[in-house]
Amino acid sequence: MFRTFASTLALGIALAGAAFAETHEVKMLNKGTDGERMVFEPAFLQVAPGDTVVFVPTDKSHNAETVDGMMPGGVEGFVGKISQEVAFTFDTAGLYGVICKPHYAMGMVMTIEVGEVDAVPSTFFEGRVPKKAKERCDAQLSNL
């Protein structure tokens, strides 16, 4: 009987966590409300572990994908197809860089903070990051 109670309690706790998870929408745009071209809106998003983010190609010819080195180690990222909606559930706390591959050089990048992040990991900008993308990412990270 205790085993059944413990199993039921564990299942209830797991389901309760899923019930409180939120879904956030990010638009992929040719022009943002601030006049900037080739943007994600919002450009910075803070979510809780277990939350899902849906990337919506409001304007065509965009995708959303994570970047190796711009997300927590051991996490398998995602790659959305051009002009198609993609959803991803962020289970692991940390910072995530998300880009639009065709417009990365134009600075189409966003940052997602999952849980509480105290500082930008030293490996977050490893590799080649286009100048405009780096500028926008730096501005987004000022939200930490």
Where do the PLM segments sit?
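Bacterial N-terminal signal peptides that target proteins for export
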Residues: 1-7
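Bacterial N-terminal signal peptides
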Residues: 8-16
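Sec/Tat signal peptide C-region and signal peptidase I cleavage site
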Residues: 17-21
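Extracytoplasmic/periplasmic copper-protein system
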Residues: 22-34, 106-144
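Beta-strand cores of secreted/periplasmic/IMS beta-sandwich domains, seen most often
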Residues: 22-25, 41-64, 85-92, 96-99
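Copper-binding active sites and cupredoxin-like electron-transfer domains
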Residues: 48, 61-69, 133, 138-144
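Histidine- and aromatic-enriched segments that form or immediately flank copper-ligand environments
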Residues: 56-81, 110
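Beta-strand-rich extracellular modules
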Residues: 101-103
